Structure formats: structure tokens, C-alpha cells
Amino acid sequence: IDDYQQACFDGRISWIGEDTLARFMDAVLEQSQETPEESAEPIRVLYTPLCGTGLECVSQVLGRIGIPYLDVVPGQDQPDGDFPTCEYPNPEERAALQAGIDKCRSWKEMGKPFDLLLATDPDADRVGVACEDGDDYTLVTGNEMGILLMDYLAGRRVARGEDLSRLVAVTTIVSSAMCDDVAAHYGFELRRTLTG
């Protein structure tokens, strides 16, 4: 710790400032295919960072794209490396999302259902989604999400009149073969890489 404190004092280590976060948010939003004005109607999102670091960035991005209602799963909003409310904080595992699913159910019973349960892993580089499915909530797998995003992004470009024949999408060797079908449908090249 002495070396760390000395490095901070000497200016060799510095904290990332709000300006860096703002530039990051701008870069993320530049990738958006749709503005809030184009959206059919506002959605209600329940979010959990699973006791990790995602709350600030995710809530800012969702707010800036016009999500009018964002609520957070209680007890999972602040970073806590002991993960007291979810033993295994993987957003693709149902057990990790159970507190969020329970809150979705209770709000649905009150007549205020959420449209989407969104979760990020503790370092906010993986995402999980659960959607209402009758009386239950279904998790969208990583493969399903990738295919949905690929189809959505390609479809938006086609709707704007873009020629996709010169585009290349990249996925991994473990991703669903449906990626090939989406690429063939829209006429762009798909390349596969090793994982990691």
C-alpha cells in the first residue's frame, strides 16, 4: 500500500475523471441505432449490477437514451465483493437473477409490471436479460441475445437503405449457427474466431 500511495502522490497513478466517463458514454451512445423519439413507447426496466460496478454507467446510458423508468434490485445496487444476495453473480444464471425476478413478480401483481429485467456481472462486461413469459420469466441466453442484436442491427441498416454486402460481422466458433443464417439473409459476411 505504501508503494500505491506514493505512486498516487507522485502522479504516476490517477483516478479516471468524470470527463473520461462522459466521453465513454458519448462513444457508447454513438453506436445507438435508434433515438428515443423513434421508440414506440417507453419501457420500464428493472436493473441489477449483482453487487458489482455497473450501476453508474448503466443507469447513465439508459437515462441518456430516454428510458424514463429505471429501478434497481434492492441489496444488489452497490459493489460488495461478498455478494450477499447472490452466491454466484453470473447474469446468465437464473439463481443470480432470482431477487430481480421476485421483484418483477411483485410489481406485476401491483399492476406495475417491468418490461425487462437487465443484469450485468460484477465488472459489467457481461449482460443477462429476463423477460416475462406468462406466469414466469424466461432468461435470454447469450446466443439468443447475439442473434437478436445481429438481426436488429442489420435490419435497421437495411431500413435506412444501406447495402450490407461490404460489411463483416465477427463472432466466435462457439456461437450459434443461426448467426450464419442471419448473415446470409441480410447478405453480409460472417467471420468466426476462437474464443477468448
In which residue ranges do the predicted regions lie?
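Short, ordered loop/turn segments at secondary-structure junctions
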Residues: 75-78, 122, 174, 195-196
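Short helix-terminating capping/connector loops at secondary-structure junctions
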Residues: 38-41, 110-113, 160-166
